[in-house]
């Protein structure tokens, strides 16, 4: 790992922070690779051969805009930009080596939607390029013939986007007025993409005609998509998952000297997950691994509490 950083502070440390550039190389990742015939008892072996590189910049700033006897305000902000790329997956360079299929999805048997490939970000989506009608509706089963051989085969799949964000932001702030205290924390993610597996596995008309003669649930997006059968590998289901999320807001009041002129009592209320702004069509764009199979939204919670110090 290589990094260059700078810590700074101004105005009697009322403004502090840091900036850092890093290059992080991860080596000897395990991969299941082919080996020449006759060199082993099997044609494939598990071995430490993979390399991954991360390059990025991190910036943070903490400030106290107001600091008075009865009123204070502090704020913290950070931003991280990072790019990852796989640099090696086999013992020797092999242009014909496709990569490592990963990212299992619901629908079909053994289907995957992601791949680790040299020269691309980890967990890149491996999909077909969807063709659309003039009205913007995807045309079922019609994809771009990327290799120009006149037919649609696995060779026409391409690596499209990735789950990791390009830029990530964080914000915290706290305002104190006399015995009142208000704090909040939020995050933003830009450039992360999500495979909407809920949509790909539920938004097609054949689900309405089940052979057991009972109705299944379908997504309302079926009206815009219009597929009769599932098209799991269409890039139509790879969607921008950029978001702005407010994690929590907390308001409290502290009663001083309530226990025989000593100690204090703090009463507070917290609203968790109060706000999410995103163009993603699913319930929540913040999913682990970039594959969304979640049919239940993240809960919004209200907490009340009391802290007593003697």
Predicted region positions:
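Repeated loop/turn-to-beta-strand initiation elements of outer-membrane beta-barrel proteins
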Residues: 12-17, 57, 68-69, 179-183, ...
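Outer-membrane beta-barrel "beta-signal"
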Residues: 58-61, 78, 298-310
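Transmembrane beta-strands of outer-membrane beta-barrel proteins
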Residues: 15-17, 73-75, 79, 171, ...
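Outer-membrane beta-barrel and related beta-rich outer-membrane complex signature
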Residues: 29-33, 73, 81-101, 191-216, ...
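Extracytoplasmic gating/loop element in the C-terminal half of outer-membrane beta-barrel translocons
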Residues: 137, 187-272
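Conserved small-residue
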Residues: 47-53, 57, 64-163, 279
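Membrane-embedded beta-barrel scaffold of Gram-negative outer-membrane proteins
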Residues: 1-40, 73, 80
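Transmembrane beta-strands of outer-membrane beta-barrel pores
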Residues: 21-27, 63-65, 79-85, 177-179, ...
């Amino acid at each position: 790992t290589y990094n260059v950083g700078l810590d700074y502070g101004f105005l009697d440390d009322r403004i502090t922070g840091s900036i850092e550039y890093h290059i992080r190389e991860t080596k000897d990742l395990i991969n299941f690779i082919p080996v020449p015939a006759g060199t082993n008892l099997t044609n494939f072996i598990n071995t430490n051969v993979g390399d991954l590189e991360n390059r990025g910049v991190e910036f943070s700033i903490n400030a106290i805009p107001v600091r008075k006897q009865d009123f204070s305000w502090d704020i913290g902000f950070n931003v991280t930009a990072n790019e990852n790329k796989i640099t090696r997956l086999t013992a020797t360079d092999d242009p014909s080596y496709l990569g490592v299929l990963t990212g299992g999805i619901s629908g079909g048997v053994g289907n995957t939607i992601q791949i680790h490939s040299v020269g691309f970000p980890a967990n890149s989506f491996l999909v077909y390029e969807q063709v659309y009608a003039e009205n913007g509706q995807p045309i079922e089963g019609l994809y771009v013939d990327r290799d120009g051989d006149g037919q649609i085969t696995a060779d026409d799949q391409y690596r499209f986007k990735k789950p990791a964000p390009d830029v990530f932001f964080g914000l915290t702030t706290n305002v104190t007025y006399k015995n009142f205290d208000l704090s909040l924390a939020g995050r933003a993610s830009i450039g992360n993409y999500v495979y909407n597996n809920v949509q790909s596995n539920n938004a097609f008309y054949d689900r309405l005609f089940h052979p057991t003669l009972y109705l299944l649930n379908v997504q309302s997006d079926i009206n815009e998509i219009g597929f009769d059968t599932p098209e799991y590998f269409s890039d139509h289901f790879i969607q921008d998952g950029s978001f702005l999320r407010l994690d929590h807001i907390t308001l409290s009041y502290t009663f001083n000297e309530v226990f025989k002129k000593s100690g204090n009592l703090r009463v507070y209320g917290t609203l968790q997950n109060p706000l999410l702004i995103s163009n993603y069509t699913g319930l929540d764009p913040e999913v682990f691994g970039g594959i969304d199979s979640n049919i239940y939204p993240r809960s919004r919670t209200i907490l009340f509490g009391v802290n007593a110090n003697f």
